[in-house]
Amino acid sequence: MKKPQKDQMWVFNKDIEGEQASEGVVRKVLAYCDGMMCVENQFEKGAVGNLHSHPHTQITYVASGKFEFTIGDEKKVVEAGDSLLKQNGITHGCVCLEKGILVDIFTPMREDFL
């Protein structure tokens, strides 16, 4: 299975194929419905999540690794166990300082990821 179906109750990570989101970043769309979406992003050290904004509210959980995040005008280093809130429309991005995984929850779902 490459990507799960909308409203799929059970999604097993091992069954999902990742796709290259950018250099050094592999994205896996996990469970989702119209109202929200869970996405795993695997970052290599030095990979960049370019500054961007979108009309979705986003919560990021740092599952592993270390990242320097920019949200609006603030820049902070976060590591495993930390979480971040990015309101819709705010500019944000990151640089991976130590190889790691970010888990993002978006509301509503990101149709552009399907």
Regions found by a protein language model. Give the residues of each.
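Ligand-binding loop in jelly-roll beta-barrel domains
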Residues: N88-D112
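Glycine- and acidic-residue-biased ligand/ion/polar-headgroup-sensing regions
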Residues: H56-F67
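Short acidic-glycine-tyrosine-enriched beta hairpin
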Residues: E74-N88
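A cytosolic small-molecule/anion-sensing beta-strand core signal
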Residues: A63-S64, E79-A80, E98
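Conserved short histidine dyad/triad with adjacent acidic residue
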Residues: M37-S53
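A short, N-terminal "cap"/entry segment at the start of jelly-roll beta-barrel domains
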Residues: M1-G35
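Histidine-centered metal-chelating micro-motifs
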Residues: V48-G49, E68, L84, N88-G93
